Structures are given as structure tokens and as C-alpha cells.
From Swiss-Prot:
TM helices/strands, residue ranges: 52-72, 109-129, 147-169, 197-217, 225-245, 262-282
BP term (GO), one: nervous system development
Lineage, broadest ranks: Eukaryota, Metazoa, Chordata, Craniata, Vertebrata
Protein name: Transmembrane protein 41B
Modified residues (Phosphothreonine): 18
UniProt family annotation: Belongs to the TMEM41 family.
Amino acid sequence: MAKGRVAERSQLGAHHTTPVGDGAAGTRGLAAPGSRDHQKEKSWVEAGSARMSLLILVSIFLSAAFVMFLVYKNFPQLSEEERVNMKVPRDMDDAKALGKVLSKYKDTFYVQVLVAYFATYIFLQTFAIPGSIFLSILSGFLYPFPLALFLVCLCSGLGASFCYMLSYLVGRPVVYKYLTEKAVKWSQQVERHREHLINYIIFLRITPFLPNWFINITSPVINVPLKVFFIGTFLGVAPPSFVAIKAGTTLYQLTTAGEAVSWNSIFILMILAVLSILPAIFQKKLKQKFE
């Protein structure tokens, strides 16, 4: 079991160093691997690493929340009812209420509304907080289609990349402790598609095979390059966002987020998913043929 665990961490690209030195602690030497003292030392190190990671994560979250507070304070003066509706939408009713407020101020305070939308979307994506699907729908209600699509793709790409960097900085203990088995399996898939990684990321973003939050937090651990990750995400979220944005043009006719997706749109998404992975398949077949 221990050997399997070591192998899994090796596949995930984990690197561990053991400090060696003199002094009071050095007089008794390092504990032998597998001994009770060694297990205690390992537990202390892991516990300290987890606490430090949590402290850094909380600090970053509070800093981001403060930025969101400043964005909100820079918003125009709102009535009591409007302030109540200025929240991250959890259902379609919340989205409609928020859309009503934003559309009222969008023309007069265009930059403030755009910055608030941009910052909120990235905040949700960075910390894997649910609600971005409703913001995608709202973009179709608030802005022309080309701008809405670019805005959603950019926010998704940046937010996911910030989540990637956050995981790279403090998320490794979480991945190692809770997601090791799944991350190892995905690491094997990534290695299999290493030559066509952008196509593979696009495919994953279009299809529902892996949750977006899982892709975001495990990618740095299994050595997916950030540039490839961003480009694949930016392009991969476009087809699903297209569906959500088009639904936003009829926002007040929707009662649930599920109504934004029709069987026709699902069929189109599946076709686009297949097309995204075809170049990799064809190149692999040609390579095998010539070899």
C-alpha cells in the first residue's frame, strides 16, 4: 500500500526533500523510514504544510473579497430593493432580479457595470464558487453577442488560470490527500494526449466528463502548462457559453438554468467536442501508419 502511494505521488510530480543538519535534533539522527518516529515526523510536516496552505488560501480569499467590496462601493447609489438584488445569483429568479438592476445602470455607468461583472465572474471562477452559469446567461441579456462571448471566454480563462495558480501555490496537499486516485488517472490521460494537449483541454471543457473545478485544481499538479491550460480553456468554453448567451437574450422567459440548454444545443456541443479531438486522432493514425 505504501509503495502504491509513493508511485501515485511520483506520477503526480510531487517532489519531497528531507532537511538534514546538525545541532540538538541531529544528535539522535533522523528516524528510520517506516519507524513510529518517522511516521510522527511525516505527520507533523504534512500537518504544518496543510495549516500554512490554509492560512495562505484564507489570506488570498480575504484580499480578493476586499477587492470585490471596493468594486461594489464604486457602484452608483442603489435603492434598498436594488441592494438586496445585488448578489451572486443562485437561481433564475436571482438572475432576473440582478439583470434588471444591471440593465438599468448599464448605459449610464457602463464601465462600472462592466468592471463589476468582470470582477465577479473571475472571483467565482478563481475560488470555484457556483453561479458563473447565471452570469454567462446574464451577459447575453446585457451585451451584444460578440462582446458577451469574448467577455465570458476571457473571464473563464482568467478565472480558471487564477484557480490553477492558487492550486499550484497551496492546493497540492488537498490533491494528494483527497484526489490522488482520480488525479493519477487523469495524469495518465494527459500524458497520452501530451502532443495535443490544447485539443484535449478544449474537448474536456466542452464535454461534462470532468468537472471544471477538478480540471482547474489538478492541472498544475500533473504538469499541464499554464499557457496551454489558458488557451484550451478560453477556446473550450466558447461553445457552451454560446448556448448560455443565446439563452440570455430571452432571460425573462426562462424559469430554470436547464431551459437554456436544448437537445439541439447538446447535439451541436457533441459535434464540436468530436471536432476538437479529431486533429489529434488523425495525426496519431498517420504517425502509426508511417512508423
